[in-house]
Amino acid sequence: MLNALAMVQDTNVNRDSVAVMAPYFPNGDDKNYGYPWTDGLKAGRGSTTNALVWSGSQWSAGANNQYPHNSRNTSSYYILDELVRYFDDKTLFPNMKQIVLAGHSLGGQMLQRYAAIGDQLETESPVVLWIANGDSWAWLSDYRPLNVPDCPTYNDYREGFAQFVEYGMTYGASLVAQGLDAIKANFDSKQIAWARALQDFGNHASSCAPATTGQDRNERFFFFMKWFQPSCPDPSGTNCDTVDLVDAPHDNGQMFHSAAGLARLFTDNFYGDKSRAYDFGYPRKQQGDDPFPDPNLVNTPGATNYNTYAGGLTYQGCWTDQAPTTAQALSTLLY
């Protein structure tokens, strides 16, 4: 992130004018590295300090902490709330113009679910959630675009909102109890800068649920965009979504260093003038994935290969005449 900051051309955007903070959510793998641990004590008592520690990757979905054993009611999303409030405090940061929460991969998953159930903080400074290349998303409806019967847990939290409290959640429980319409309304009220690496076709799903929304990160992203389209009703307002398509693999450094990354993380609204860059990355992939279109590029054609092949076939972005069908020629077309 700091290396990316150093690449910004505007010399006013630097380490003296931009505060960068990376929160640390330790888990059991961090014993005696992130927090002290004493072997031989009763189960759950080995962590002997007030350090907040989470179970596995549950921090990424807002679950309560696992340690210390006598205080286990702190959600990782409460931590994000407090960080936002801290940087929004004008007595500490009188010149704060914008707050960006940035998450790549599992961090992106964290922020997408935070967008869905996160509290309305009523900040003075605009807040943007930069969400990039998550492996799965919490769906805002009971519908899934792909096969559901083979996955009875498809709608459990973190991919849906069933079994929410059972996951270890107290944060957002009252909102989730109101139902999906309330969750979606809360999600839609958040300002999200989506970032998608177009070379990222990875899949690290550990359950069947993500596969009901696509076979890999690429499919899952575009299915989510199709069903829950971002919007930018007022580019100078505080609820304008953007979607940036970046020619990169699953690499946070390349995402941060891209022109899109530099804009969303550092230069958008830097001077408090409500300015923001248009969506990056043309041609676009599907209808609805361009909430803040660049008027000079919006009509960029998708097909760049104009050759005619055997049988009069022309290239339209993917081959769909393969037999038998392969992963490169899916029966369900996304875009």
What are these regions (language model features)?
Residues Q98-V100, V128:
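Residue in the alpha/beta-hydrolase core beta-strand immediately N-terminal to the catalytic nucleophile
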Residues E124-D234:
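The feature captures the conserved acid-bearing segment of alpha/beta-hydrolase catalytic domains
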Residues A43-L92:
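Alpha/beta-hydrolase active-site loop
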